[in-house]
């Protein structure tokens, strides 16, 4: 991997972490079209660095919210910040359970299945289209909604289902305010990213990585900057009901994937 590869992969990670296009689905499509060996090899350490960069970009964009949450928690009272934190924890449970118990099985079943990815992208397109047409409200995410949104995040482990698309769409379709839905969606994944990073660090596999520091630094900066742009842009798009743009994109790519699968 060279500097150019690091920049490209960093930008892709930064954009697809927030834009509702399914990074896992695009990765599977890229492998199918280019072949596994045509893609640059990513070390585990490089992947961890990119995820850390996007998590950090989320914290920067929502720095005011994060500060208020921690300030509220330090008061040790049953306040709005404590309730929001509990909702985040509830939303994490389905993905944690599925990730710990079924991640390898899901990869074995659906990894490389382009036809499946195509149909999942069509589902993502439908969710985004429906959410885009939903009326905006002032409703906050409830505890029940937090769990349902968490279930949609767990389902988004399937290649082709966008995590941000599934969680934001589910939240909006449950009647929640669009801006609050985007905020909840992006904040709920941060603890999971840090948890995954901690798991990888404890595995000891990172010690075997030989990735050059300049590659890591370049990838980090690219992912961080792309993440800042994508996260801010996505919030604006949700506010302005522009999710239909991504619905059309996912529909076209999903249809192309299905045609490609049958043509093989």
Swiss-Prot record:
Spans through the membrane: 42-62, 82-102, 109-129, 146-166, 184-204, 215-235, 243-263
Keyword Transmembrane: yes
One Pfam family this sequence matches: BacA
One GO cellular component term noted in the UniProt record for this chain: plasma membrane
GO molecular function: undecaprenyl-diphosphatase activity
Membrane topology: Multi-pass membrane protein
Alphabetic keyword roster: Antibiotic resistance, Cell membrane, Cell shape, Cell wall biogenesis/degradation, Hydrolase, Membrane, Peptidoglycan synthesis, Transmembrane, Transmembrane helix
Catalytic activity: di-trans,octa-cis-undecaprenyl diphosphate + H2O = di-trans,octa-cis-undecaprenyl phosphate + phosphate + H(+)
The organism's place on the tree of life at top rank: Bacteria
Entry annotated with the keyword Lipid biosynthesis: no
Documented EC number(s): 3.6.1.27
Localisation per UniProt entry: Cell membrane
Family: Belongs to the UppP family.
Name by which UniProt lists this protein: Undecaprenyl-diphosphatase
Lineage: Bacteria, Pseudomonadati, Bacteroidota, Flavobacteriia, Flavobacteriales
């Amino acid at each position: 991997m060279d500097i150019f590869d690091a920049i490209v992969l960093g930008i892709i990670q930064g954009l697809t972490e927030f834009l509702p296009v399914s990074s896992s689905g695009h990765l599977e499509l890229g492998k199918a079209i280019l072949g596994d060996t045509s893609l640059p090899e990513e070390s585990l350490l490089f992947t961890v660095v990119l995820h850390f960069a996007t998590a950090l970009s989320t914290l920067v964009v929502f720095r005011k919210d994060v500060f208020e949450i921690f300030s509220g928690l330090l008061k040790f009272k049953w306040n709005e910040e404590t309730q929001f934190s509990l909702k985040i924890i509830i939303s994490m449970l389905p993905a944690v359970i599925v990730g710990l118990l079924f991640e390898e099985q899901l990869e074995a079943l659906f990894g490389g299945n382009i036809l499946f990815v195509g149909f999942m992208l069509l589902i993502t397109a439908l969710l985004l289209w429906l959410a885009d047409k939903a009326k905006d409200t002032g409703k906050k995410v409830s505890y029940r909604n937090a769990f349902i949104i968490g279930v949609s995040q767990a389902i988004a482990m399937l290649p082709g289902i966008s995590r941000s698309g599934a969680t934001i769409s589910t939240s909006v379709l449950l009647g929640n305010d669009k801006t609050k839905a985007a905020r909840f969606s992006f904040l709920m994944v941060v603890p999971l990213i840090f948890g995954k990073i901690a798991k990888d660090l404890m595995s000891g596999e990172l010690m075997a990585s030989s990735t050059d520091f300049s590659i890591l630094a370049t990838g980090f900066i690219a992912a961080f900057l792309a993440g800042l742009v994508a996260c801010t842009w996505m919030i604006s798009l949700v506010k302005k009901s522009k999710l239909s743009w991504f619905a059309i994109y996912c529909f076209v790519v999903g249809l192309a994937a299905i045609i490609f699968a049958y043509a093989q």
